C-alpha cells in the first residue's frame, strides 16, 4: 500500500534536520569531549568519561534512526516514538538537574533545542494517524 502524507516533503526535511542535529551533536561530544567541556564550557571532565561518551554515542545513534525515518517515514514510524521518549527524558532530566541538582546550565540549552523536535514528532504522528484513519 502506497501512502502519501500531506506536506510529506516538509516532514522528510525536518527528519533530515533531526538526523543531522543528532549526528553532529553526538559525534562532536563523543570525539571532542575534552575540548568542549574544558575548553569551551569551562567544566571539569567527568570522573568516568565513558558514561558521557556512551550518552554521546546514543545521541549519534538516534541520528541514524532519524535518518532511517527520513528515508522511509512509514516503515520507521516506531523510531519516531522512541525519539519522542528519548528527547522527553533528556529534556526532563536536563531541566531538573539544572534547576535542582547543580548541573551546569549549558546542558539545558540542548533540552530547549530538543523541545521543537518533540513537538514536530508528535505532530507527525498525529498527521500519520489521521491519514491512516481517512
Where does each model-flagged region fall?
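Membrane-embedded alpha-helical segments of multi-pass transporters/permeases
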Residues: 27-30, 67, 95-98, 119-125
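Membrane-water interface at the C-terminal end of transmembrane alpha helices
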Residues: 116-134
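Juxtamembrane helix-break-helix junctions at the cytosolic face
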Residues: 4, 64-78, 98
